[in-house]
C-alpha cells in the first residue's frame, strides 16, 4: 500500500486540485468504491468527485458492488485505451448512462498504461514519463 501512495505522490507533484486519500490503502477490509466514496462524501459533502477509469471498465461497471448507488455519487471520466473497441465502449456508455451514471468521454490522449504497469515500473525502478 505504501508503494501505491508513494507512486501517487510522485505522479501528482506540482499538480494543483488533486488530493490523495489513503482510505483504501491501509484498510484491512476489502475496498469497494461505493464505500470509499461514501466516506469521502461524508467528510467533504460540498466536493464533487470524479472517478477516472479506463473506458474498458465501463463494460464491467454494472457488476461493481452497489452499482446503482455508486453511479449517483460521482462523475466517471472514461479514458480510451489502445486496442479497445469504440463500439463496445459506446454500448457500455449507453447502458450506464441509461442507468443514471454521468460519464465524461472526451478527446483524451490515449494512454496505453494500466495501474499494473505503473506498479511494475515503480517496483523495478523503471522510468515513468507522463
Question: What are these model-predicted stretches?
Answer:
Residues 1-130:
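Nucleotidyltransferase catalytic core that binds NTPs
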Amino acid at each position: 500500500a505504501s508503494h501505491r501512495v508513494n507512486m501517487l505522490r510522485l505522479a501528482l507533484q506540482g499538480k494543483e486540485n488533486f488530493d490523495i486519500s489513503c482510505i483504501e490503502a491501509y484498510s484491512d477490509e476489502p475496498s469497494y468504491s461505493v464505500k470509499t466514496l461514501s466516506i469521502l462524501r461524508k467528510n467533504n459533502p460540498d466536493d464533487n468527485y470524479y472517478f477516472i477509469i479506463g473506458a474498458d471498465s465501463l463494460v464491467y461497471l454494472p457488476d461493481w458492488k452497489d452499482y446503482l448507488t455508486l453511479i449517483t455519487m460521482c462523475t466517471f471520466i472514461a479514458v480510451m485505451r489502445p486496442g479497445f473497441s469504440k463500439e463496445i465502449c459506446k454500448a457500455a456508455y449507453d447502458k450506464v448512462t441509461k442507468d443514471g451514471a454521468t460519464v465524461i468521454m472526451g478527446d483524451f490522449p490515449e494512454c496505453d498504461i494500466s495501474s499494473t504497469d505503473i506498479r511494475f515500473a515503480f517496483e523495478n525502478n523503471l522510468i515513468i514519463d507522463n
